[in-house]
C-alpha cells in the first residue's frame, strides 16, 4: 500500500500544494456564491497564502540543498562562518515566505519597510532558483556524459563553482533590478493610425496607464510622481487599463488621492484587471474613482469628442477582466457585445481590455474594433519571468497590427507587482497620438 510517510519532503509538499489548489477550485465552484463577499475574500486569501507558500517551500528545499548543503558540506560540527551562512539563508527564506503575508496585512499609504524587504528577497529567490536549476541541469548532463571517475570528480567540483556563480549573477541582477524599478516611468511616444478617425480628432493625445499595483510596495509617493508626469504631457484623455490596486479602498484611500489631480481635457477612464478583482472591493474602487472624476467602463462605453464638434466622436469602451467570471464576482464578467452596444461602425472603436487574451477574444467577436489597449504582461517584469510572460500571451509588449484595420498596443505597465524589481523590462507611461489612417 502507498505510504505517505515514505515520500520525500518535496513529494509531501507537492501533494499538499495539489490539495490546496483543488480546494480553491471547489470553493470557487460550490461555495463562493453561497457566502457573502467578505467571507469569500477571506477564504480566497487563506487558500492563496497556503498555496503560494507550498510552492515556495518546494523551491526553498531545493535552494537549501544547493546553497547550504553543497557549499557547507555535511559536517557534524559546522564552523562559525558556516553557521552564520545557515542563519542568513534561513532568515532570507523566512522573509520570502512572509512576502505575501505583507500583501494582506502590511498595506498602508506608503510601503512598510518589511514589505519592501520581503518582496525584494522574493525577487532574489526567483532569480537564484532559475540559475541554480539551469546550472543543476547542466551538471546532471555532464554526469550523464562523463565516463571516467576523474571526469565525474571534475563535474562535482564544477557544481560547487556553479552554485557560487549563480549567487554572484543573482546579486548583480537583483541590484540592477532594484535600481531600474526605482526610476521614474519612461514616457514612450507612440503614433497610431486609426481608420475612420474624424478630422476634428486627428492628433488626439491619449495617455495609457496600467498595472500601477497600489499596495504593499507601491504607495502614494510613486503614484504622485506618475500623476505629475501625466499632467506634464497635457493629454486629451487618460485611460487606466486595469490592475490599479492590490488591496481594499479602506487601506489605500489616502494612497490613491493623487489620481484626483489628473486633468485631461476630455476625461479619465478605467477598466478592471484581474488584481482589482482579487481585492474583492471593485465596487468600492468604482465609487472612489467616480468621486475623483474617473469613469469606470464596466462593460460599457463613453463617447469621446471635442466640445466644438460633438457630432465627431470615438467610442471608447472597456470590458471587465477575463477572471471576473472565473472568480464568480457578482454582476461582473467580460461582455464585449454589451460594452459596444450603441457604438456605431461608422466611427472608430477603441477598447480597453486588461489581458492580451481578452484582446484576442474581443477581436474574434468584433473585428471592427480599431484599436485595443492592454497591459497585464509587465513585459515579464523581471527575468526569468519574461520567458513565461512571452510564451503565455498572444501579445507580449508594444504595438501589433492584427489586421488591415486593427491594432493592439500592450503596455509593460506603469508600476510593478509586489517585487520592486524590473529586469529586461521598464515601467512606462505611454503617450499615444491618434492619427488618421
Curated annotation (Swiss-Prot):
Ranges annotated as spanning the membrane: 7-27, 41-61, 87-107, 116-136, 164-184
CDD domains registered for this protein in UniProt: MPP_YkuE_C
GO cellular component, one term: membrane
Membrane topology of this protein: Multi-pass membrane protein
Cofactor needs: a divalent metal cation
Record-listed a divalent metal cation 2 binding positions: 243, 274, 376
GO MF annotation list: hydrolase activity; metal ion binding
Compartment annotation: Membrane
Pfam family, one: Metallophos
Family indicated by similarity: Belongs to the metallophosphoesterase superfamily. LOC643853 family.
Protein name: Transmembrane protein with metallophosphoesterase domain
Organism annotation: Danio rerio
Gene: tmppe
Amino acid at each position: 500500500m502507498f505510504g505517505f510517510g515514505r515520500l520525500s519532503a518535496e513529494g509531501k509538499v507537492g501533494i499538499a500544494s495539489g490539495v490546496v489548489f483543488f480546494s480553491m477550485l471547489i470553493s470557487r465552484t460550490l461555495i463562493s456564491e453561497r457566502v457573502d463577499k467578505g467571507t469569500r475574500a477571506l477564504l480566497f486569501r487563506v487558500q492563496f497564502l497556503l498555496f503560494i507558500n507550498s510552492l515556495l517551500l518546494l523551491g526553498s528545499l531545493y535552494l537549501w540543498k544547493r546553497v547550504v548543503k553543497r557549499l557547507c558540506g555535511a559536517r557534524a560540527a559546522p564552523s562559525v562562518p558556516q553557521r552564520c551562512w545557515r542563519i542568513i539563508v534561513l532568515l532570507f527564506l523566512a522573509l520570502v515566505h512572509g512576502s505575501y503575508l505583507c500583501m494582506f496585512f502590511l498595506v498602508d499609504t506608503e510601503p512598510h519597510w518589511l514589505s519592501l524587504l520581503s518582496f525584494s528577497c522574493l525577487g532574489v529567490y526567483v532569480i537564484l532558483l532559475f540559475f541554480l536549476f539551469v546550472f543543476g541541469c547542466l551538471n546532471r548532463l555532464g554526469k550523464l556524459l562523463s565516463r571516467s571517475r576523474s571526469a565525474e570528480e571534475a563535474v562535482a567540483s564544477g557544481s560547487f563553482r556553479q552554485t557560487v556563480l549563480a549567487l554572484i549573477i543573482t546579486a548583480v541582477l537583483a541590484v540592477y533590478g532594484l535600481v531600474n524599478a526605482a526610476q521614474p516611468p519612461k514616457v514612450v511616444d507612440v503614433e497610431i493610425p486609426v481608420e475612420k478617425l474624424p478630422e476634428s480628432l486627428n492628433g488626439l493625445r491619449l495617455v495609457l496607464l496600467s498595472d500601477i499595483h497600489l499596495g504593499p510596495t507601491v504607495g502614494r509617493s510613486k503614484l504622485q510622481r506618475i500623476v505629475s508626469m501625466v499632467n506634464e504631457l497635457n493629454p486629451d484623455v487618460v485611460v487606466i487599463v486595469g490592475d490599479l490596486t492590490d488591496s481594499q479602498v479602506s487601506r489605500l484611500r489616502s494612497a490613491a488621492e493623487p489620481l484626483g489631480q489628473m486633468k485631461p481635457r476630455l476625461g479619465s477612464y478605467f477598466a478592471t484587471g484581474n488584481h482589482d478583482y482579487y481585492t474583492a472591493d471593485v465596487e468600492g474602487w468604482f465609487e472612489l474613482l467616480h468621486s475623483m472624476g474617473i469613469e469606470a467602463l464596466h462593460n460599457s462605453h463613453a463617447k469621446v469628442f471635442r466640445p466644438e464638434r460633438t457630432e465627431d466622436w470615438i467610442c471608447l469602451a472597456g470590458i471587465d477582466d477575463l477572471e471576473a467570471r472565473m472568480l464568480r464576482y457578482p454582476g461582473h464578467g467580460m461582455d464585449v457585445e454589451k460594452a459596444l452596444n450603441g457604438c456605431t461602425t461608422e466611427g472608430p472603436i477603441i477598447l480597453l481590455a486588461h489581458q492580451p487574451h481578452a484582446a484576442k477574444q474581443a477581436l474574434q467577436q468584433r473585428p471592427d474594433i480599431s484599436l485595443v489597449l492592454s497591459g497585464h504582461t509587465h513585459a515579464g517584469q523581471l527575468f526569468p519571468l519574461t520567458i513565461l510572460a512571452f510564451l503565455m500571451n498572444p501579445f507580449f509588449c508594444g504595438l501589433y497590427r492584427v489586421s488591415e484595420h486593427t491594432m493592439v498596443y500592450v503596455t509593460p505597465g506603469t508600476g510593478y507587482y509586489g517585487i520592486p524589481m524590473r529586469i529586461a523590462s521598464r515601467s512606462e507611461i505611454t503617450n499615444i497620438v491618434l492619427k488618421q489612417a
